[in-house]
UniProtKB/Swiss-Prot annotation:
Species classification: Eukaryota, Viridiplantae, Streptophyta, Embryophyta, Tracheophyta
Keywords on record: Cell wall, Secreted
Source organism, top-level taxon: Eukaryota
Chief site of localization: secreted
One Gene Ontology term, aspect cellular component: extracellular region
UniProt name for this protein: 44 kDa cell wall protein
Location(s) in or outside the cell: Secreted, Cell wall
Amino acid sequence: AQPPQADFL
């Protein structure tokens, strides 16, 4: 799954 850093936006 996608990394947590992908939700910084």
